[in-house]
């Protein structure tokens, strides 16, 4: 097994007290956000549940700023996501009934990768992002915590994996400090998310 399971994702979020408005973990058939007036978050897999899933991404809705945040740890663009996973951000947005006659939804997505393709840590990065969202809301990306991560050009073979590996070290330190569940299960979680788990670069 590699990566986080749905149960582990929820338990990590719970340990960080980040479950207010959390709709759950979903596969590629996520129905979308439907409540315009409440904070909502979700962690979605780009693959079908019955096939074990492929890659986690995170979604968050801030009704105050009317912004939907999409976070992909690998930073893929829509065409790349479709090419690699047969998954579309556009379809995801369309399924969310958040627009109104007098307000347009502003979609904000990261354009850089923060995770190395050699690691199985997409679930951990998604939990970290939702922590940033709950703490900073409309500044989910533009805050000192998230900006502690190095950004890189999205690529199957990262041009500078060293910086992305530093992000992983930062992530483990963050969870070790903030999450009792992580501390209690550190060896198991690290073994399933560690750098070098997937052969993607030398």
Curated annotation (Swiss-Prot):
Q: Specify the enzyme's EC class, one word.
A: hydrolase
Residues of the active site are: 55, 72, 122
Query: One Pfam family for this entry, by name?
Result: Peptidase_C5
Q: Name one GO biological process term.
A: proteolysis
Where does the sequence pass through the membrane? none
What's its EC?
Answer: 3.4.22.39
Q: What induces it?
A: Expressed in the late phase of the viral replicative cycle.
Q: Which GO terms describe its cellular component?
A: host cell nucleus; virion component
Q: How is its activity regulated?
A: Requires DNA and protease cofactor for maximal activation. Inside nascent virions, becomes partially activated by binding to the viral DNA, allowing it to cleave the cofactor that binds to the protease and fully activates it. Actin, like the viral protease cofactor, seems to act as a cofactor in the cleavage of cytokeratin 18 and of actin itself.
Q: Localized where?
A: Virion; Host nucleus
Q: Which UniProt keywords apply?
A: Autocatalytic cleavage, Disulfide bond, DNA-binding, Host nucleus, Hydrolase, Late protein, Protease, Thiol protease, Virion
Q: Does the keyword Ligase apply?
A: no
Q: Which reaction does it catalyse?
A: Cleaves proteins of the adenovirus and its host cell at two consensus sites: -Yaa-Xaa-Gly-Gly-|-Xaa- and -Yaa-Xaa-Gly-Xaa-|-Gly- (in which Yaa is Met, Ile or Leu, and Xaa is any amino acid)
Task: Spell out the molecular function terms from Gene Ontology.
Answer: cysteine-type endopeptidase activity; DNA binding
Q: What interactions and quaternary structure are annotated?
A: Interacts with protease cofactor pVI-C; this interaction is necessary for protease activation.
Which HAMAP family does the record associate with it?
ADV_PRO
Family, similarity comment: Belongs to the peptidase C5 family.
Q: What does this protein do?
A: Cleaves viral precursor proteins (pTP, pIIIa, pVI, pVII, pVIII, and pX) inside newly assembled particles giving rise to mature virions. Protease complexed to its cofactor slides along the viral DNA to specifically locate and cleave the viral precursors. Mature virions have a weakened organization compared to the unmature virions, thereby facilitating subsequent uncoating. Without maturation, the particle lacks infectivity and is unable to uncoat. Late in adenovirus infection, in the cytoplasm, may participate in the cytoskeleton destruction. Cleaves host cell cytoskeletal keratins K7 and K18.
Record protein name field: Protease
Q: Gene of origin?
A: L3
């Amino acid at each position: 097994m590699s990566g986080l399971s749905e149960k582990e994702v929820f338990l990590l979020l719970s340990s960080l007290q980040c479950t207010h408005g959390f709709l759950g973990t979903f596969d590629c058939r996520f129905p979308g956000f439907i409540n315009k007036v409440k904070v909502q978050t979700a962690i979605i897999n780009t693959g079908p549940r019955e096939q074990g899933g492929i890659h986690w991404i995170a979604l968050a809705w801030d009704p105050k700023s009317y912004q939907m945040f999409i976070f992909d740890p690998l930073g893929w663009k829509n065409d790349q996501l479709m090419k690699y996973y047969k998954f579309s951000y556009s379809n995801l947005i369309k399924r969310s009934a958040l627009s109104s006659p007098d307000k347009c939804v502003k979609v904000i997505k990261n354009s850089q990768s923060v995770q190395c393709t050699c690691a199985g840590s997409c679930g951990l990065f998604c939990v970290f992002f939702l922590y940033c969202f709950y703490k900073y809301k409309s500044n989910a990306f533009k805050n000192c915590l998230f900006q502690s991560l190095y950004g890189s050009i999205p690529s199957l073979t990262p041009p500078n994996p060293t910086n992305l590996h530093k992000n992983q070290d930062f992530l483990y330190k963050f969870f070790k400090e903030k999450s009792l569940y992580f501390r209690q299960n550190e060896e198991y979680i690290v073994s399933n998310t560690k750098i070098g788990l997937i052969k993607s670069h030398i």
